[in-house]
């Protein structure tokens, strides 16, 4: 690895999870979580760090064309890392209140009722958007800082992520590696099951931090 200050500043690491791999069962198997975290997420971390190192080298050599190509890898692997960090935070076992809807006395709960009528309706809309993703991608429940703090459900393809003014509250991975070992090609069952372990408390904190 390069010892340059720029690389050291930009290096990322695989985060530790707040729960055991098997603690989301039966909704998401421990094996899926272990492979997803240790293998897939780690690949994005390694790819990003490698691309940063290559970029520093290309810039030091004045190789603009190479630097432009490398930046695409940085975007892909950096997006993969960013999305997965939020994905893990979006999940929690039932013992940590995973799946427990935000109360009507919370700011997020009030906003959901105001815009969607019920949390179940928001979930249905999110699942419909997840099902509409062709290939690999993500769905995010977001707060729009420039639209009166209104909520929305947006999707991205591959490892594209959301940026300002959108604040991601919940991220759901629609890549096959997130569900295929357990749900095979019936991804609708995965989309339905994951809400049993969604960390609404974390979503509420993120909502409140951008009031």
From Swiss-Prot:
Gene Ontology molecular function: manganese ion binding; superoxide dismutase activity
Pfam family, one: Sod_Fe_C
GO CC annotations, alphabetized: mitochondrial matrix
Note accompanying the cofactor annotation: Binds 1 Mn(2+) ion per subunit.
This protein's UniProt keywords: Antioxidant, Manganese, Metal-binding, Mitochondrion, Oxidoreductase, Transit peptide
Catalytic activity from the UniProt record: 2 superoxide + 2 H(+) = H2O2 + O2
InterPro entries: Fe/Mn_Superoxide_Dismutase, Mn/Fe_SOD, Mn/Fe_SOD_BS, Mn/Fe_SOD_C, Mn/Fe_SOD_N, Mn/Fe_SOD_N_sf, SOD_C_sf
Signal peptide coordinates: none
Co-factor(s): Mn(2+)
Positions of Mn(2+) binding: 36, 84, 173, 177
Entry EC no(s): 1.15.1.1
Taxonomic superkingdom: Eukaryota
Membrane spanning stretches: none
Protein localization: Mitochondrion matrix
Annotated function: Destroys superoxide anion radicals which are normally produced within the cells and which are toxic to biological systems.
Quaternary structure and interacting proteins, as annotated: Homotetramer.
Assigned protein family: Belongs to the iron/manganese superoxide dismutase family.
Protein name per UniProt: Probable superoxide dismutase [Mn], mitochondrial
